[in-house]
């Protein structure tokens, strides 16, 4: 394939990691080594590259001199080539085949869908354990070729590739443990189940921002499809039924779930969402990134019982009966209004008289004095106020600070306020 005008991997490498742009840092495989050498010595005598190379967004279109790549990059283990202009797998192969220690490769946002990946090219990636192909529009045929030639691949990222379906290869990949396939257009469970067939050892499946609308699979079949799945993200999926949440219990090793932003949970409060999900998933120890403690689980399960206690029997979920067996039938919690009082009826004592007065608790002591001025026939400047809590073991408390708010005294109905004159 003809290469568009651009820059080579080696050109960018030498520019970015030149002595002028990459200051010396102590430590193995770090920084730049500049020995005293005669003019015209090989380039590899001028640079000592780090083991992690980040060359994203550099306009790279081709490999460059393969001998120089081999001389520079024998020790490199991680390579980020994302957001470049690589569109020929042969050029990628020329780079990777000369980086023998490479374990992590990021090719995101390169237009590689414009060429076919041949098995001979893919073979040069054989040591890679983590491969990122986000927004590369890599076809499933390309993915299958990669899976055939990368026997040690453990993590694969296929996000933003516009997949609407999943295509299974002829041979499954037993090495893969983590698959990120977020932000695609997968909607039907018939497509998602193929991932279980392709990757039987899968530990983590990230399906966020797809539109999977239901888990249409019998429980026993789910256990066979994903026997090792420990973590699943269905963040912003299209799930609309509690039955789909219950089916997550069919994954025999599932411990971690992400379920934010699904239509099913929209009508519920934040507290209800978490408690109802925790109660339905007894084996899940982490929900939406937060650990589920034993105390939270018990609170959630008790909440679940009370939530469904008045629901018709035909609508009660099966989990309700399991929890009734565990805790027994629970009475609804008493409703307690914890909002602070806005007013109180108090007894105002003055000149051997007692009057019941309703006072606003958001006002200050100075404002209360003005309210009482007419009643007690004293100017505010001559007024002394004492608050007496009828349940407190101590005597009256002088209300001496004019700017203090009445609610800070904890005034309640039935308490007493004594008014005296300073002239007494």
Swiss-Prot record:
GO molecular function, one term: alpha-tubulin binding
Chain segments annotated as coiled-coil in the UniProt record: 350-375
Record-linked Pfam families: LRR_9, Ubiquitin_2
GO process terms (BP): microtubule cytoskeleton organization; post-chaperonin tubulin folding pathway; tubulin complex assembly
Residue numbers of Phosphoserine PTMs: 18, 41
One GO cellular component term: cytoskeleton
Function per UniProt: Acts as a regulator of tubulin stability.
Gene that specifies this protein: Tbcel
Residue ranges of LRR repeats: 73-98, 99-123, 124-147, 150-172, 173-197, 199-224, 226-250
InterPro entries xref list: LRR_dom_sf, TBCEL_Ubl, Ubiquitin-like_dom, Ubiquitin-like_domsf
Keyword Coiled coil: yes
Cell location: Cytoplasm, Cytoskeleton
Domain Ubiquitin-like: 334-424
Location, primary (coarse class): cytoplasm
Protein name as catalogued: Tubulin-specific chaperone cofactor E-like protein
UniProt organism field: Rattus norvegicus (Rat)
Occurrences of domain LRRCT (ranges): 262-303
Keywords: Coiled coil, Cytoplasm, Cytoskeleton, Leucine-rich repeat, Phosphoprotein, Repeat
UniProt key word DNA damage: no
Disulfide bridge partners, by residue number: none
